[in-house]
């Protein structure tokens, strides 16, 4: 396997970044340069939430000039929402190849990619152009899902990997929040002027500017990587023969006294990785072995259930949902508050992720979503859409967001890398990620249509799925907190030795 060697460590321009203790240390600086991509991830997923109706008007998707919710607009909006997730499926599959050329290199590619994609989206004048641009945006998001967590994992202190890993999710939620916040400048939707809806010059500019914004964030990311954070990760440098370069970065992350231990840990990890590759089982081969097939299927089911909590319907389509419960002028304000809660409630996850077991958090998240949606469904069936019931529905969405932000959101991605043994980790985790994106498409694509029919249908579906998820986690999912790297609580040492040999476990 040919890997591009990037000997990018230079003596000049890097010495100003010194080791510092605490959470906001050297690692945090490097992580921040990567988390700008996480911000773009969240922003791109949510940006359509507040501007769809303006696109409908400018592109004239409805023959009636006073309507923005005709069948054609709902269908095209559904395609635009789902296209991001379809693109992400493709991008996540390609990302494993991209990171082989360097973790920092992959971030540079992502930032450059989003400059062009954001400009293309902002200048779109036809449905097919904006659909193509949104597919490309999704492809970039797919690249981010692998590249950023890998960069963070390899650029952080071993005792803080969990906390820093949550920063990826934190910046995703911050991007979601900013996307909805910027929608406030557009007011409460397109205004009817006489016998038709007409957009003001500001409205026509602003929705395009919102698509353009990731270009500015990407330029900032490129500047940070070129001017300040020029180094590749210590793992990548060591793996490609630049041991001295790896030492220099580790001094900044760990301090001079702990470099030898950190370097030895990298060497051991690389040796284990090589052994795992030599002994690796292909996904098809692993699926033929009952013990491996079991853990692969469990991971895929767990990953799929995350989307069936309804998180991406709220993130990508909260404005449409709140139209069923609120006056028009309060919709975007409530979406801003909801995304702010989503952002703020990710902070507790930074501190509890290493204190509470993964399984406990997953179970708690499911209970939270059930308590959020099930009472709403019952109330709407008994009393109908009264003001009190609508208020309960809104409160339910907030409880769901809080529950997800401190549990299923960040925990799933950590768990998927802890549940699989090293010989199938890469391929199995990739498959689980693919299933997650496919389930997102299944949930998001029809959400516009179902919301128009009845929000209760969605709430009932999410409630039932979370009840099933709770039972599934309770009886089939095992705790992974504190486990050894490369092992699995689902497959015994003897079972692994039987299939890959004693010397390679």
UniProtKB/Swiss-Prot annotation:
Keywords: Cell membrane, Disulfide bond, Membrane, Sugar transport, Transmembrane, Transmembrane helix, Transport
Catalytic activity of the protein: D-glucose(out) = D-glucose(in); D-fructose(out) = D-fructose(in); D-galactose(in) = D-galactose(out); D-mannose(out) = D-mannose(in)
Extracellular side: 49-78, 126-134, 187-208, 316-332, 380-393, 452-456
GO cellular component, one term: plasma membrane
Cystine pairings recorded for this chain: 62-70
Quaternary structure annotation from Swiss-Prot or TrEMBL: Homodimer.
Protein name: Hexose transporter 1
